């Protein structure tokens, strides 16, 4: 509990966090269930719109202890004890430089044989996209709760676009707090409004070509407590 409390306090204060073994364990206990659930909602949206193929290649940037990975696995293969499904194939690549990769390695060891996973113990800035067995593009690029950890998230996301399939999806997911929400909107607008073919289709679909919102992307402010009448 002490580790988790310190972790949350440092995060909310904007302080640097050392991702050692203790922090990784804290993340697994505290954050994994929430990240597992969050990815499921997004994958459901992609499926409803026909944007999630049965067989897909995935890059999970800042994969952490495996919340998004497990959510993706169970969404594709189901939450059953059957670990030999006959349909679907996921070529999953995780980029994780911290001690969380050790936890992730154990988590991925319990997945289906058709969930073929590779852990790249590297920062995304140093990651070599074409160093693997194939240089096929990715169908899904996941930036789950990691953009706020990057020195230049816009440059990183822009670089990843060249490794995305023409009909692929980049998923940017951040915690619902003020700083990360505002930064996420800034990244989104820099990418979609730049010299790329990237478009935004969820959760705020762009309806008019060349037009984009200019608000800060945060609508919740803390106000003084309401005085309850006697």
Regions picked out by a protein language model, each given a short descriptive name:
Residues 167-174:
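Conserved beta-strand signature within the Rossmann-like core of class I S-adenosyl-L-methionine
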Residues 17-49:
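Class I SAM-dependent methyltransferase Rossmann-like catalytic core
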Residues 54-64:
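Conserved class I S-adenosyl-L-methionine
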Residues 138-153:
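A short SAM/SAH-binding and catalytic strip from SAM-dependent methyltransferases
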Residues 154-167:
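A short glycine-rich, Lys/Arg-flanked "PGG" loop and its adjoining helix->strand segment in the class I
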Residues 65-86:
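Conserved SAM-binding loop of SAM-dependent methyltransferases across substrates and taxa
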Residues 176, 183-230:
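Substrate-binding/catalytic lobe of Class I Rossmann-like enzymes that use SAM or dcSAM, i.e.
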Residues 1-14:
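N-terminal auxiliary segments of SAM/dcSAM-dependent transferases
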């Amino acid at each position: 509990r002490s580790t988790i409390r310190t972790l949350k306090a440092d995060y909310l204060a904007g302080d640097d966090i050392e991702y050692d073994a203790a922090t990784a364990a804290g993340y697994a206990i505290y954050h994994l269930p929430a990240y597992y659930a969050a990815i499921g909602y997004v994958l459901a949206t992609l499926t409803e719109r026909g944007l999630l193929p049965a067989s897909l290649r995935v890059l999970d940037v800042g994969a952490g202890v495996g919340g998004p990975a497990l959510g993706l696995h169970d969404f594709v293969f189901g939450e059953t004890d059957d670990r030999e499904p006959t349909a679907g194939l996921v070529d999953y690549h995780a980029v994780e430089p911290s001690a969380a990769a050790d936890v992730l390695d154990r988590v991925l060891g319990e997945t289906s044989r058709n969930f073929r996973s590779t852990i790249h113990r590297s920062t995304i800035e140093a990651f070599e996209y074409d160093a693997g067995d194939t240089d096929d593009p990715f169908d899904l690029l996941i930036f789950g709760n990691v953009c706020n950890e990057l020195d230049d998230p816009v440059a990183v996301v822009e670089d990843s676009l060249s490794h995305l399939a023409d009909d692929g999806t980049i998923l940017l997911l951040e915690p619902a707090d003020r700083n990360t929400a505002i930064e996420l909107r800034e990244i989104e607008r820099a990418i979609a409004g730049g010299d790329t073919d990237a478009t935004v289709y969820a959760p705020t679909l762009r309806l008019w070509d060349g037009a984009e919102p200019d608000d800060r992307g945060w609508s919740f402010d803390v106000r003084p407590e309401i005085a309850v009448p006697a």
